[in-house]
Amino acid sequence: MKPLHYTASALALGLALMGNAQAVTTIPFWHSMEGELGKEVDSLAQRFNAENPDYKIVPTYKGNYEQNLSAGIAAFRTGNAPAILQVYEVGTATMMASKAIKPVYDVFKEAGIQFDESQFVPTVSGYYSDSKTGHLLSQPFNSSTPVLYYNKDAFKKAGLDPEQPPKTWQDLADYAAKLKASGMKCGYASGWQGWIQLENFSAWNGLPFASKNNGFDGTDAVLEFNKPEQVKHIAMLEEMNKKGDFSYVGRKDESTEKFYNGDCAMTTASSGSLANIREYAKFNYGVGMMPYDADAKDAPQNAIIGGASLWVMQGKDKETYTGVAKFLDFLAKPENAAEWHQKTGYLPITKAAYDLTREQGFYEKNPGADTATRQMLNKPPLPFTKGLRLGNMPQIRVIVDEELESVWTGKKTPQQALDTAVERGNQLLRRFEKSTKS
């Protein structure tokens, strides 16, 4: 029989170990990263957890951006929100008005962790900052710009220079016709049509998408994307669609799969699609800048970001917020932010991550990997090309999708579709404006 004092000591040790295990603070993190991107999110969380045994980040895929935002807000209303919610860029105004969030600069301040907001690339951080205080409301994470992916092997077969992607939309239309004639099922397809064909088309060509500097200067903004330049662009795509040179394959990122499986020779898609293209494409491909309108004065201007940021939700305890601050600080460290950028194709969110990536020779070894960054920094942004801050923007994107689909199916002219999209979208803007003043 073991001595009593030994048994008591063992019991005390066991209880202490149990207490330590129970002291681990679990931090739910809801996101929209799937495929290779989801694997990278899991990898970052696992590494943080290993380095910080008192905390456990639990990443959970909750569907696409719209589904995740809806799930997060619904969970907040029932008191079951995650600690961290990934929300796409057009959900920024909605999150600001939701009263469901705790600004990240407050989270860091209360946790006693130094937070250098100036470390983030200004054109990215400006999108997620409080326009009154200049402080970050959410932390940039997977920021992107649209880029052009093209099949170099298909270019060769069609008699096109594989090192020269089309620079203008007029060039792209010509290339798509030649690629289709050479035997490709699809010359060109586009992902995220509202973000690329209207929001970024407008910024890249120096045009406003909405008044009040795209909503940054007030909730009384009105949509302005039904002007002659945008109508002409959609009309060009309509003509390509009729000829079979442009294929509409879906509202989200469906065109990326059509590209990497070899169906479509070119696609405009998020720079964040690069991870899946690297993984699945079985041909030589290139990454080019977004085309611009050859008739646009002073184009190209600058791209506006897409992707998402990380919002901290209200209603958590102090220890949870301390863990959240530590995790966000971990993500922003140069080596981690650089790794995320290099593995996914998303933008380097900090200056240090960009510098480190360049010093490591990544851009020299991977031509085109800096395309998204060069587009974002192509020219200093104009007041109306730094992004969008429009209420109910996720719903407005759905309206834009519906109206553009009416063009691709021949039910409306480009002018009719964009006029209707502006009219319907403005109704949502007025509803949002009213809600912020009530």
Swiss-Prot record:
Q: What induces it?
A: Induced by phosphate starvation, via PhoB. Also induced by carbon starvation, via the cAMP receptor protein (CRP).
Q: Which residues form the signal peptide?
A: 1-23
Matching PROSITE patterns: SBP_BACTERIAL_1
InterPro entries tied to this protein: Bact_solute-bd_prot1 (IPR050490), SBP (IPR006059), SBP_1_CS (IPR006061)
Alphabetic keyword roster: Chaperone, Periplasm, Signal, Transport
Task: Report activity regulation.
Answer: The chaperone activity is activated by the transition from pH 2 to 7 and inhibited by the addition of G3P.
Coarsely, its chief localization is: periplasm
Query: Where does the UniProt annotation locate this protein?
Result: Periplasm
Disrupted gene: phenotype observed: Mutant lacking this gene fails to grow on both glycerol-3-phosphate and glycerol-2-phosphate.
Instruction: Give disulfide pairs as residue numbers.
Output: none
A cellular component annotation (GO) from this entry = membrane
Q: Does the keyword Signal apply?
A: yes
- Pfam families registered for this protein in UniProt: SBP_bac_8
Transmembrane regions listed in the UniProt entry: none
Entries under SUPFAM superfamilies matching the protein: Periplasmic binding protein-like II
The GO annotation for biological process reads: glycerol-3-phosphate transmembrane transport; glycerophosphodiester transmembrane transport
Q: Does the keyword Zinc apply?
A: no
**Where does the chain bind sn-glycerol 3-phosphate?**
65, 89, 144, 270, 307, 346, 397
> Its family?
Belongs to the bacterial solute-binding protein 1 family.
Under the subunit heading, UniProt states: The complex is composed of two ATP-binding proteins (UgpC), two transmembrane proteins (UgpA and UgpE) and a solute-binding protein (UgpB).
Q: What does this protein do?
A: Part of the ABC transporter complex UgpBAEC involved in sn-glycerol-3-phosphate (G3P) import. Can also transport glycerophosphoryl diesters, which are hydrolyzed to G3P and alcohol during transport. The G3P moiety can be detected in the cytoplasm whereas the corresponding alcohol is usually found in the culture medium. Binds G3P and glycerophosphocholine, but not glycerol-2-phosphate.
Which NCBIfam families does this entry report, sorted A to Z? PRK10974.1
Q: What is this protein called?
A: sn-glycerol-3-phosphate-binding periplasmic protein UgpB
